[in-house]
A protein has these predicted regions:
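Active-site donor-binding segments of glycosyltransferases and PAPS-dependent sulfotransferases
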Residues: 1-70, 207
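Membrane-proximal helix-turn-helix segments that form the acceptor-binding/catalytic region
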Residues: 94-114
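Carbohydrate-associated surface elements
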Residues: 120, 142
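Conserved donor-binding/catalytic core segment of Leloir-type glycosyltransferases
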Residues: 154-170, 176-181, 187
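Nucleotide-activated donor-binding/catalytic signature segment of Leloir-type glycosyltransferases, i.e.
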Residues: 190, 196-219
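Aromatic "clamp/platform" in nucleotide-sugar-dependent glycosyltransferases that forms part
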Residues: 233
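Short hydrophobic beta-strand element within catalytic cores of glycosyltransferases
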Residues: 241, 250-253
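Conserved acidic donor-binding segment of nucleotide-sugar-dependent glycosyltransferases
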Residues: 253, 268-275, 282-289
Length: 330
């Protein structure tokens, strides 16, 4: 298993595969390697690529972000996890062309199998890169066993609405517009920009924010909140939905891309581009006790799909498939 050297304050990939590896069966023999250098600049990436080539084994799994590690590896022994195609949407011009070729087009050609974390990401990837869709397998993210059900009486007088993330796609300005005038407190996880602070003040939002939390501190934020607002405009998966589900909190999330797939019947789905629709979803959760209870009950059931043991088993089966493929190609 080949992992990137973590970027500053960005450990989502590492958290995901840490939980998966812990759930591997004891008879699975594996080695886990982390690139020596962060994925920045030509020479660092070249070193990482050569190092990966020297350490390759019978089956090689590149766990995301460092797609270029596959360049020198044996194609029939290698699989690559692609988490999303977000950077292709953000970049433009020559930078986008180079990124597309080096991170998507070439790696897809250089590996035996690809895993993605949602059907939505699979469809998106196939829009960008032509390949046999049977080469792409959907294996979802898993929910850490550290998350536990934590029932809590709903604070109907002043609910705490949890917002995870402040990046552009997390849609904080639209959320602020949507909840303006609703008695509640917006608890924001992530660093706020001056512009975002101005927007929150302009809509007279009662809010607090915190960043750089540990995993256990993030879990505590879910426990203390009354509901999750996750009206994102772009996700490859949408892990906060499942984290709120397993904790026992009702969820308002977007009706686009991977989020309906991940949420199932365990969230109130809204149009993330329509502040009024977001507002209606929040008010429905705040005002309808039976609806809240239904979402919470459905959430507990939904979260079972993403247990580490279930996800790990899917990876193990794929490793066996890649191994047999490499044996037959000799």
């Amino acid at each position: 298993m080949f992992n990137r050297k973590p970027q500053d304050a960005n450990f989502s990939v590492e958290r995901l595969f840490k939980d998966i590896v812990k759930a591997f069966p004891p008879n699975l023999i594996y080695n886990s390697y982390t690139s020596k250098f962060k994925s920045r600049g030509f020479w660092s990436r070249l070193y990482n690529t050569v190092e990966a080539f020297c350490k390759q084994g019978d089956v090689n799994h590149i766990t995301g972000d460092v797609h270029y590690l596959c360049y020198l590896m044996s194609k029939n022994k290698t699989l690559l996890t692609i988490l999303d195609c977000g950077n292709l949407k953000r970049l433009n011009g020559i930078r986008r062309t180079i990124f597309y070729f080096l991170w998507f087009w070439l790696p897809v050609k250089k590996v035996a199998m690809i895993t993605v974390i949602s059907e939505s990401t699979k469809k998106e990837l196939l829009q960008y890169v032509r390949c046999d869709e049977r080469k792409i397998r959907v294996i979802p993210c898993c929910i850490s066993d550290d998350f536990k059900p934590s029932p809590k009486a709903f604070n109907s007088s002043n609910p705490v609405l949890l917002q995870i993330g402040t990046a552009y796609n997390k849609n904080l300005p639209k959320v602020a517009e949507a909840i303006s005038g609703i008695p509640c407190h917006l608890r924001i996880i992530g660093k706020l920009s001056e512009e975002q602070i101005s927007q929150l003040l302009a809509f007279d939002i009662s809010y607090s924010s915190v960043s750089n939390l540990t995993d256990l501190e993030i879990i505590d934020e879910y426990i203390k909140c009354d509901a999750l607002i996750f009206a994102s405009t772009y996700e490859g998966f949408g892990m906060p939905i499942v984290e709120a589900n397993i904790t026992g909190r009702p969820v308002v999330t977007s009706n686009i891309l991977s989020m309906p797939e991940v949420a199932g019947n365990a969230a109130c789905l809204v149009d993330p581009y329509d502040a009024e629709d977001i507002r209606k979803g929040v008010l429905k959760i705040f005002s309808d006790e039976d609806y809240r209870k239904t979402l919470v009950a459905n959430g507990y059931q939904n979260a079972r799909r993403f247990k580490p043991a279930i996800v790990a088993e899917q990876y193990v089966e794929l490793y066996k498939e890649v191994y047999l493929l490499s044996m037959h190609s000799k």
